[in-house]
Amino acid sequence: MEKMYNVGKIVNTHGLIGEIRVIATTDFPEERFQVGNTVYLFEKNSKKPEKLIIRSHRKHKNFDLLMFEGFTGIHQVERMKEGVLKIKEAQLTDLEENEFYFHEIIGCIVVTTDGKELGEITEILTPGANDVWVVKGSDKKEKLIPYIADVVKEININDKKITIEVMEGLLD
């Protein structure tokens, strides 16, 4: 099976006309959820993907609201709750220099400029102005690292290693 990448998690339905509420797990929701694009639904207890074509997309608060071709009512989409939306690797587009996909960053080891290993990036949050990386260390505690130039000094995707400058108060 072709490699697939998460682009969103379905958290609920929205209204009665078959709209679903999605938390995007991609930096490119406008591109991924463009009308006519294909996504693949992996329902909570299923390993077999369902191919879906996006009929509409709009933003509402912190969510992406989607409708799919062939789905016209809440009764048809309720089963999708807690499902994951994915795209095939062939659907990925080339990025500019120093731009990265979430799946390239997640799993990287974070070290400080003085060589101290902080842990592995397990999640990327997108609260607003910049992404925030969740780093879990050997102590199982989570550290939140902002993806800003003052902090992130080097990203080496091939070695899965990211070097950061620890600003005062960052790890307190």
From Swiss-Prot:
Top-level lineage group: Bacteria
Name of this protein: Ribosome maturation factor RimM
UniProtKB keywords: Chaperone, Cytoplasm, Ribosome biogenesis, rRNA processing
Organism: Listeria monocytogenes serotype 4b (strain CLIP80459)
Family annotation (InterPro entries): PRC-brl_dom (IPR027275), PRC_barrel-like_sf (IPR011033), RimM (IPR011961), RimM_N (IPR002676), RimM_N_sf (IPR036976), Transl_B-barrel_sf (IPR009000)
Domain-level remarks: The PRC barrel domain binds ribosomal protein uS19.
PRC barrel domain: residues covered: 96-170
NCBIfam families found in the cross-reference section: 16S_RimM (TIGR02273)
Biological process according to GO: ribosomal small subunit biogenesis; rRNA processing
Complexes and interactors: Binds ribosomal protein uS19.
